[in-house]
Amino acid sequence: MAAATRSCRPWGSLLGLIWLVSAAAASWDLSSLRCNFGSFCECDFQPDFQGLECDLAQHLAGQHLARSLVVKALKAFLQDPAPTKPLVLSLHGWTGTGKSYVSSLLAHYLFRDGLRSPHVHHFSPVIHFPHPSHLERYKKDLKSWVQGNLTVCSRSLFLFDEMDKLAPGLIEVLRPFLGSSWVVYGTNYRKAIFIFISNTGGEQINQVVLEAWRSRREREEIGLQELGPVISQAVLDNPHHGFWRSGIMEEHLLDVLVPFLPLQRHHVRHCVLNELAHLGLEPRDEVVQAVLDSTIFFPEDEPLFSSNGCKMVASRIAFFL
């Protein structure tokens, strides 16, 4: 999936461009002055809904449900001047379906410096919590890190990748921060956003989509009402998931479970064309076909879904160019 730009809205007329540049310059002068004397936290937080929705529509292949749920939840949360709790999203689905891509887009379109922002915190089990025997130290460090950074900036984004590989018991230290009753002195921690990413529930999502296809239902007809329960059960039944016995799901601290559907051949083709455009290359039928031919689709008797979504598209394009 192609990398994001700050806004994918095309330029309009020359007059409109001149006005936009003038307005941007005036806005920059005022905001720069304010940021020099004010809070860098608030200045770094610059939501761009138009850019986000445009990028999701153009580059996120086959995920009507995820796109709708994320945008709706985010808009409702940010339009509330006094939210009662942080926004907590849990992204679920097969590998390569766009979970990490969406989380990176959120960072990109919410913060001026995107993933490089000091207010965006990205955690990976392999990098940050590699040794299960150090669990108690990790719990202490994680709680301290979250509380300290929320004290500095309430508009913080915390991304937790590969929840399937996170040591059970670690994430329970976040439980007080995800509800409405915790007190972090000096800041409104309820303005924070937490995003959890995992493959758990992917098989169950795939099965629902496969059954819909067999029943000749459009995938756009699949809703959260039929996917939410199977995802929740898959998480609760998985002793290796970071939410295992954490109380987070049991106490309903997740605002939205976001399902990512398996990708079909035409979705992978969409990813290939997007990646070629991102590289500044014209569409080449032989490259597109070569990537599709090298992609494994499942199930074996009905090769419908890509086994790794669009995850390998970029590397395969480089190989076939």
From Swiss-Prot:
GO terms for biological process: chaperone cofactor-dependent protein refolding. Residues 1-26 form the signal peptide. Gene3D superfamilies: P-loop containing nucleotide triphosphate hydrolases. Keywords: ATP-binding, Endoplasmic reticulum, Glycoprotein, Nucleotide-binding, Signal. ATP binds at residues 93-100. GO terms for molecular function: ATP binding; ATP hydrolysis activity; identical protein binding. It comes from the Eukaryota. It is found in: Endoplasmic reticulum lumen. One of its GO terms (cellular component) is endoplasmic reticulum lumen. Glycans are attached at residue 149. PANTHER family: TORSIN, TORSIN-2A. Belongs to the ClpA/ClpB family. Torsin subfamily. Homohexamer. Interacts with TOR1AIP1. This is Torsin-2A.
